[in-house]
């Protein structure tokens, strides 16, 4: 998926206020033909531009129609649910939410926190094995990883070689349910 498919601009809404440009931490936005555009190679996908745009000209890509098509096709779809979602929307447990998601057509729901637990064990192991004391950077946050790779490439080797928790959770869900 390209970055322009994740962050999208509604060109008709842009009023050239430049708030997105002023607030982008990596200066990955330029104006061309009076429309803000993301410089893909520099964007770290932090979504700061979405948060500050008073015109709502920047939006996240909506995957809901694609998910609905996959569910409608009859495939077994597993929802990987981040624990923050449960807290934010007042669900008591993944089980309660799973019932709701199944009514919407999902086959199962999986608690993505399980991926973080596995990742924590791997981080602990790697840090214990580390011979030399050096700066290490977690691979947990894709924005941080992208920032390091685009702005501080000399630190790329300091990123711990561990899959992000969402990927670990997806693999665990596949193991458990497929």
Describe each model-derived feature in a short phrase.
Residues 2-9, 15-44, 48-64:
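Iron-sulfur cluster-binding cysteine motifs and their immediate structural context
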Residues 12-14, 90-91:
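Short, surface-exposed ligand-recognition loops at beta-strand->loop->(often short) alpha-helix junctions
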Residues 61-178:
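Iron-sulfur-associated redox domains of electron-transfer enzymes in respiratory
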């Amino acid at each position: 998926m390209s970055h322009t498919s994740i962050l999208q601009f509604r060109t008709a809404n842009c009023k050239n206020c430049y708030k997105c440009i002023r607030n982008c931490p990596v200066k990955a936005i330029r104006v061309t033909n009076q429309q803000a555009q993301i410089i893909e190679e520099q964007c770290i996908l932090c979504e700061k531009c979405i948060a500050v745009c008073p015109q709502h000209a920047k939006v996240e890509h909506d995957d809901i129609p694609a998910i609905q098509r996959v569910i409608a096709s009859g495939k077994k779809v597993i929802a990987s649910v981040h624990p923050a979602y449960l807290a934010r929307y007042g669900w008591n447990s993944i089980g309660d939410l799973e019932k709701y998601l199944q009514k919407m057509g999902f086959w199962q729901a999986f608690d993505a926190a399980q991926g973080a637990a596995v990742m924590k064990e791997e981080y602990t192991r790697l840090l214990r094995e580390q011979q030399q004391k050096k700066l290490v950077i977690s691979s947990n946050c894709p924005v941080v990883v992208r920032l390091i790779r685009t702005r501080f490439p000399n630190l790329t080797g300091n990123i711990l070689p561990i899959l992000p928790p969402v990927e670990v959770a997806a693999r665990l869900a596949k193991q458990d349910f497929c």
